[in-house]
Amino acid sequence: MKTLTRKLSRTAITLVLVILAFIAIFRAWVYYTESPWTRDARFSADVVAIAPDVAGLITHVNVHDNQLVKKDQVLFTIDQPRYQKALAEAEADVAYYQVLAQEKRQEAGRRNRLGVQAMSREEIDQANNVLQTVLHQLAKAQATRDLAKLDPERTVIRAPADGWVTNLNVYAGEFITRGSTAVALVKKNSFYVQAYMEETKLEGVRPGYRAEITPLGSNRVLKGTVDSVAAGVTNASSTSDAKGMATIDSNLEWVRLAQRVPVRIRLDEQQGNLWPAGTTATVVITGKQDRDASQDSFFRKLAHRLREFG
């Protein structure tokens, strides 16, 4: 009898331990898979592609790659004498047409005063037409001069904001064309996190919810707030044919990959360029308030650690 009782006790204890282990694993797995978090997150920032509005030879490059610059600081300079001479030529054209317009105005006025008694109507109309033509040429020359005044200023390329110069690929002596990107400027204090959340986890993501950001390769946890959730993503399985009809790709019903939706997260504190734009991180949405790590259960701590390893 004692032997039977002992066997039943061992069996019951083993069964209870198995059930508890199953429950623990199940809860950890559910929390790991269904809670709003993602490893597919990246630091981002506002980036300005700087391109000159004039073409010419680069005479001076005043910065080096990855340098922190201030707003309006000179980045590089394009050959100025060419545009200064073009401005002088435009001003000379304006002066010429001003003198010519004055002469034609006097001539037309004289003929209008004399009238048809001294000359034909055709000669009077011709003088007025010539005056109007010269006035139009003067207006065109003035517009050209005003535009030429802008070009010497545009030969000096300045930083539009405080930030870091990156991917600098221009050097003194090179010829640069108008509109070609010369350098990128990563704006200071503009960093944020772009987290790509699976659609199955969006129920726990709302603007204003708090977030934890763990950069890859770091144990430091940054704090942030959900700023916005994207209103739509591209439907990769749907296209349009030549007649505008929808074309839907076939898929296997038992294999459904969740779409990832961009979620923008505003950082509580800017970290400078400690984590450059494009680097990855793990993001956990904690809800309306920050998570109190000291009150987490064993399962939550385990799941949180699992996230860091993927």
Curated annotation (Swiss-Prot):
Its main location: membrane. InterPro entries: CusB-like_dom_1 (IPR043602), CusB_D23 (IPR032317), MFP_Efflux_Pump (IPR050393), PHBA_efflux_pump_AaeA (IPR022871), RND_pump_MFP (IPR006143). GO terms for molecular function: transmembrane transporter activity. Keywords: Cell inner membrane, Cell membrane, Membrane, Transmembrane, Transmembrane helix, Transport. It is a single-pass membrane protein. SUPFAM superfamilies: HlyD-like secretion proteins. The chain crosses the membrane at residues 12-32. One of its GO terms (cellular component) is plasma membrane. It is found in: Cell inner membrane. Forms an efflux pump with AaeB. Belongs to the membrane fusion protein (MFP) (TC 8.A.1) family. HAMAP family: AaeA. This is p-hydroxybenzoic acid efflux pump subunit AaeA. It comes from Salmonella gallinarum (strain 287/91 / NCTC 13346). The gene is aaeA.
